[in-house]
């Protein structure tokens, strides 16, 4: 993948976000999406409960990189890019946590393979967090 191709990839309303959001909505949960006023612009936000949910691509957010998978081309560029993404995610997690938020991050493959498990985690936090 080159940087021109990368720019074409959606960052909002991705397939994995839509899968998770539709399931939550069908269960009666109401939320905001991509809230610009919250650090990291979480994919799903339960404002009153201070819960931020991120649907992370294993590629873009570094799971494959951390597992030692190499990039096919332009390895140095991608290593820097993914390392910055990982660092930014950690900063966002810390900032939100310091401000009383619960942060949930799900890998794309977790949402695809175990949607019910992801929902169960969200439900559990939703029931115990805040109001």
Task: Annotate each language-model stretch with its function.
Residues 1-131:
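Nucleic-acid endo/exonuclease domains
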């Amino acid at each position: 993948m080159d940087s021109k191709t990368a720019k074409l990839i959606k960052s909002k309303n991705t397939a994995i976000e839509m899968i998770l959001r539709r399931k939550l909505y069908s269960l009666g949960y109401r939320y905001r999406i991509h809230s610009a006023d919250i650090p990291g612009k979480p994919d799903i936000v339960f404002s009153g409960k201070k819960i931020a949910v991120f649907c992370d691509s294993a590629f873009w957010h570094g799971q494959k990189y951390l597992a030692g998978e190499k990039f096919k081309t332009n390895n140095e560029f991608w290593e820097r890019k993914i390392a910055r993404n990982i660092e930014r995610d950690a900063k966002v997690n810390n900032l939100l946590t310091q401000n009383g938020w619960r942060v949930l991050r799900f890998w794309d493959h977790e949402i695809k393979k175990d949607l019910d498990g992801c929902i169960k985690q969200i439900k559990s936090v939703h029931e115990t967090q805040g109001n």
